[in-house]
Amino acid sequence: MEIQEIIKNMTLEEKSHLVNGATFFGSYGIDRLGVPRMQLLDGATGMNLEQVFGDMTEYEDWSNAEERKQIDADTSKPVNMIGSTRLVHVIEHYFEPEKLSEDEKVLYGWVKKHMDVRLQGKDYAPGCYPPGILLGCTWNPEVIRKVGEALGLECCVYGVHFLLGPNVNILRDPRNGRLFEGYSEDPCVVSKLAPEIVKGIQSYGVSATVKHYAANSQETNRVGIDETISKRALEEIYFPGFRACVKEGGTKSIMNAYNRINGVRCTESAWLLEEKLRKDFGFDGMVMSDWGAVLDPAKALAGGTDLAMPGPGEPQAIYDAVKAATLSEEKVDQACERVLTAIKWITENYKKEEVDKLPVDEIIKQTDEAAYEAACEGIVLLKNDAACPLAKHTKIALLGSGHAQMLECGSGSAGIDTSRHGDVAAEFARYFDVVDEAQAEYVVMIGIVPGMEGNDRKTLALADEDLAVLKRLAQAGKNVILVLNTCGPIDMREIDTDNVKAVFATFLPGMAGAKALSDMIAGEVNPSGKLTITFPERIEDMPTYMNFPGDGYHVSYGEGIYVGYRYYDKKKLRPRYPFGYGMSYTTFDCKLVDAAVDGDTIKVHTTVENTGKVAGSEVIQIYIHDPYSTLAKPEKELKAFEKVKLAPGEKKDVTFAIAIRDLASYDMDLEQFAVEEGYYDILAATSSAAEDVFGETRIYLDVKSPYSYSVDTQLKVICEDDALLEAADSAWAAEGWDIGLIRNNYQYSPQKSLREILVYLDAHLRTEEKVAHFIAAFEENVRTIKKK
């Protein structure tokens, strides 16, 4: 595929079509030029059959199918099947067609005929994988990459070319309806983990589509809501995950967001899509819109949106804009080039032929293992009053909304219809005697809270029916193992009663969730997950409490950079469960050995020893605290982590190399990142809680920065530091100048610098020679003063 040759031979009409979707989840193909149609599909939790089947009814033309004539009296008009009741039922019961009506069976037969062609006759149900919130809690890049590989493999099975994920938006507020799709409230976690799922997906020649760029952090009024966000918060909190997926993950596609940022739609923002994404991050792939996010096709294309979805789009709007000279054809050509470049990469790397040769059993084995390993490493043990693991044959009752089948995934784009579900009762029966409540020694209570695209949560409460059961169990004094099968954090105040002996957060654990949970409660698997989002003590404590979901179509990100634990630390608020927290069935002895600057990195040496009787994993977390910063900063920020697996009695050395550039903060006045010289505290911990910091030491960074002491330093800084003031006084007085001028300006204009007050000297006293001599003397004096 010679891209420039194709563009040269395309008509303007064809170009206008290429930059718009052709069907709801399909791109535009140009047969005469050898440009294939591409299949797009959500998401990063598996194959969304609603989208596969719905799109199939468009491009395979169900409207004119012979089968349709059997069940529709009037076939003279095209019919849109996406979202139709008939198709919804076929999707829900695709793996149990006996439950369909006779008319639905006709549609089912037509769909299956086309699916058999696509799947090469394979009888294969898609997997359902844990979403980002649980993957984040694994703190394990390798596990996440394996999930990505499973997704890439399944994309090849189902003929999918662009997988619409991962979602790397920061978990700003636990009430966000799509919270479960994201990885963490912390940009370091997102930046280290999300690129791995991208690599896994793309290892099969499938393009990942990192979304939603940028700051798509709520569902309320999501289409067009205007978010007021400081540039510092964007640069330090909301951009790093996308930057990492570009630089480290090599993603071939980015999806922009519905919202506006500081007044400009993400689909139309040249600053966001060209200046930041392409010039700053180095992205050279294709930008597609979220579905229906483009309101002005010409403006969106001019701003940097290459492909407007869904289809059929508005190619005529592009055509007309070029003809009216309000959009240049060169800009259209640029978008076409980006779309074609992505298509070319896929056609050259796509492994469908290879995958089609694999036995179904082998595909199932690989995908099952990926889902199970992720669930095992991501489920978090939050409380354990010596209850777990339970002894084999303990009598248990299974209660709660998830007692028969756990909530394995969210709904909407991340929804998965499959026959590969975990049977909760069967999984627990492998170890325990499952009895009714009256006979049970323990009740395993699986409470749910679903996540849903398009709607945010109003509260952090469990479902009402689950709250009622927990209240009854508390009154009866029944021993409870509480399972939070939820889309995010829960208000624990009313439910964490004395009779609740253990609490597990499974979030939405995917198809292997029930197996992983039962193995964990039985002690076959040692919990090793750690939270990547804070559980607040109460909703009023949250940093976003006053700024979510905003007023109508406006929301202020008033917390700035103080998202999650950064806010709780700053406000000295104790959450219910802190960021980075998670328990184990074993114990660990962790030590910080030393930390030192080594070239352009900070080397941090730690040790961790398993002092218990069973194998387990600990997550060593390295935080940085800047005690004397010029800019306001959080009390600490996560900069590195590693999950370490240890046999009983085993001890390992764990060394971190933190790039000095990773300590940079964004200065909005200077409009740049800068690392300030001075002292930094290195904190080694097993969570963000103060009591989990096992070692602390201080280093000094001797770097040149915009904040280095000079004649441009503010008088406030100079006059409030004895060493600096002495350096200024001696250099000033050496020129015969009155040091009282420094004091006087400090009192009334402390924001001014030494350079700025030179103008107040009499002209005969501030000759060029004297000024130059003073500057040289002062800067020599401060050269040896260590910056706080």
Please tell me what each predicted stretch does.
Residues 700-720:
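Low-complexity, Pro/Ser/Thr- and charge-rich linker/hinge segments at domain boundaries
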Residues 374, 721-724:
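Thiotemplate assembly-line natural product biosynthesis machinery
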